[in-house]
Amino acid sequence: MSFIKSRKKIVTTAIASSLSVIATSAIAQDEIAKLPTIKAQATAKQSLKVDQSANTKFVAPLLDTPKSVSVISKQLIEDTKVTTLSDALRTVPGITLGAGEGGNPNGDRPFIRGYSSESSVYVDGIRNSTSQNREMFAVEQVEVSKGSSSSLGGGGSVGGSINLISKVAKKGDSLEGSVQGGTDDYQRITLDGNKDFGNGIAGRVVVMGHHNNKAGQGDDATEYKRAGIAPSITFGLDTATRATLSYYYLKTDDTPDAGVPYNNPNNYAAGSGKPIDVKQGIYYGWKDRDFQKQENQIGTIKLEHDLTDSITLSNTAVYSKSKNNYVWTQPDDSQGNFINPTTGQLKDTGIWRRANTRITDTDSFSDQLALTGKFNTGSLKHSFNAGAEYSKAESDKGSYTITDPNTKNITGAVANGACSLGLVASNGWCTSTFNPNSKDPFLGTITPNRAVTTTTSETTSVYVLDNIEITPQWLLDLGVRWDKFDTELKTNATGVKVENNTDFFSYQAGLTFKPTENSSIYASFATSANPVGIDAGDGSETAVNANNKDLDPEKARTFEIGTKWDLFNDKLNATAAIFRTEKQNTRIQLDPTTYTNGGDSKVDGIELGLNGNITDKWAVSAGYTYLDSENTNPGPSCGRTGPCNPINAAKGKQLPNVPKNSATLWTTYKVLPQVTLGAGAVAMDKVYGNATNTKWVPGYVRYDAMAKYDVNKNVNVQLNVNNLSDVRYFSKAYASHFATEAEGRSAVVSLNFKY
């Protein structure tokens, strides 16, 4: 890869930034009081309430931060036993998960407040937007920032961003882990050991092994297998100069889920648009052909030096490598194989197992240099973070070539005889609508066709964030960031290149009034910019191409008014906010080959939250979000060929992947000194998959339960039952073709230990 050729420049950048930290140490005082490390919890006791973000770009406590931030705490992760980021995000209202056809069809594709945040996922404040299914085994907590926020993290972040906080070496000795088993061949083991070697040195290793089938589908269907390890070592604990080296590795080998077609395919538009009425847990995939193999690695070097007792200089250098290779079944509806176009009745003449394939190999490097701390200018007290960032990513994309003894099987076309009654029993490319056979033999060949295109993206940024205490009752929050973003797509066979080069400013401003020390009322404004190719071509965002190479970044802005209160001796946090996000300059299509900036959309909303302890025995994490979305100017309606229609049916419609109402609840109560009971619910309104609102999945309410028995102070046994009532619902709605059915009821027993 040409990425290797630029490694010398990258290494030089990292060394130069890191040496600036070390050189400063040499001229500083011999003894400097260490700036207290901010912890997610104020005390050693874990809680559902988190007071301070682990991201240093949040320069004030969350209570005094003028924007909505939801934190999935370590306690909530342990209570619910979530194992993936997608599972964890279901505990946050206002977030939905999107499906894809290519790029990232089965990976993390969250929508926050109505807009995609796939390219706005961070690990320890460093962008991590490659297409993948993220694991929770090495995650301490997850922070979800709501609203436009490019001033915090750069391009993207229209509806918000997600930051995963990693488990790294710390002071003290500890050993904890969990051995789990459950329904659907669920098997999982995690081990987390931290050793304090003295002299300011500590090491930590977290390991995980996992296997399960998708709940409700039985054997020979969707299957998940993965293993991971995350070692880290820290030097200089409790000193003015600290260094942390960490590594993360995750390997997965899954059989992906295929989903269920909608009931209004191309040949029967009169269908209502919901998924077809077939049995719960149906699986249209092809075990002998389908797979998804991922490998993700992250290496990090973080250096910190306290210039004074209130100013810290830090540098974080990260190199990551990601692979995502798959062949998965899209249960295609484009050929009209399974429905009678006259009556709309389902036919058992077969679902075409269209093969979607991808080979992606992405390398990236990021370096962040930051100066953080506190200082005064007269009577004004500043808490700030100022820094510079550089990143470069290179993504090779290819696909698999699939051959078959009978080419009509691959096309799925009825005109060629595919999916006829005579082929259902013998042709794996088409399977029964009502009783699909996942074990059909695959007689073809799968050949990799690697590195068809290479996308290179480079970002240079500088920013300043400042929280100013004007008086103890009035706080002013300001932020500005400048990004230069360059992206290039090269077709390797021809050498043809297209590129998009842009730069943009992002801003945030907020004013906070504190009626009391433990409360705040705020008003804020923030912007974001979404340039072409923000995910470096590795994901569902459209990469730069000949049609969009000259377009400007999409723009968004969020207005928010809210309040936050710490109640019951600061053990419980209550929040409320009203907001509007407006997206402007959206890329729209004028004809089959011409795009421009000209679209608009908006989301108005209300958000309520409650996190922490009502009593010492009763804990709760709850939230509600109302989203009123509208596609105010979608542009003309254009197909792949032919002229565009100036009248677009999407105008005035609800945005895709945006439920009007969504709510989450998790609560636990210690009924006896050794017994804790928990219950949860997730509720969501109807969600549309496409812009014209003709494809949709119904709303639902899902219930969960937990019971935990403390054998002693170090060991407990925990039972989690998810989807208690075994309700059938769909977790993802794609814009065409299919929706993804969620898991049925499952139960997991865990033996947990902590020393």
Question: Where would I find each of the regions flagged by the language model?
Answer:
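Acidic, small-polar-rich N-terminal luminal/periplasmic segments of exported/outer-membrane proteins
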Residues: 20, 35-172, 561
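Acidic/polar loop-and-plug regions of large Gram-negative outer-membrane beta-barrel proteins
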Residues: 210-215, 221, 227-306, 321-362, ...
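Structural signature of Gram-negative outer-membrane beta-barrels, strongest in the C-terminal barrel
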Residues: 236-238, 362, 381-393, 453-583, ...
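Membrane-embedded beta-barrel scaffold of Gram-negative outer-membrane proteins
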Residues: 303-306, 310-318, 322-328, 521-522, ...
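Gram-negative outer-membrane beta-barrel transporters
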Residues: 580-582, 597-692, 725, 750, ...
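C-terminal beta-signal and adjacent terminal beta-strands/loops
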Residues: 683-690, 708-755
